[in-house]
Amino acid sequence: LGIPNGGILVALGVALALEAEFNLIVSRKIPLPLSPEGGFGAVTDDGTTILNEDMVKRFNLSPQQITYQVSRVRSDIRQRSLLYHRDRPPSRVKGRTVLMVDDGLASGYTMMAAVESIRGRQPREIIVAVPVASATALPKVEKVADRVISCVAGFGPEFYVSDFYRYWHEPSDDEVLQCFKEWGLRHRPNIEMLGKIPQKDTDTR
């Protein structure tokens, strides 16, 4: 399961390499009111919400400010979910191993919310896999996931996922949809068989 937008391109590569089922979960940062580049938590497409209480206290955010920012993110998520899931039902994860992928972990809250959301659907195991993660995000995500795999850990005082990529851009919605078309073309026989075979021992990656 990739987290759009950036995580979808990484997840596609992983899914193709492992010949795994490919899908997504929408999880978005809750931006700070006067500093949208920063965040104080995350929300997923099923409403799962995790707040960064340290940031809430640091910026003295009121309940009204929190509610307003969360409602704005949920509105954006609804639109994205309609776009991304229009021809793609959610994957069946109960009793299965789920590999959750993003382009990196900065604060970790976007992934934490996604993990908590999927946990409620009773998977056998949740593995988080990312190319890079900040040293502060890793222990937070390790508390909610069964395993965390990161190729690189960043220990600097300032951490930006984009700094670890030679070529970086935020994929458009069209690019996200194109990833699913590419996976579908390569795995059409597998897609047709999903409804015909038992899913217990088939991993969702």
What residues fall within each predicted segment?
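PRPP-associated nucleotide enzymes
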Residues: 1-205
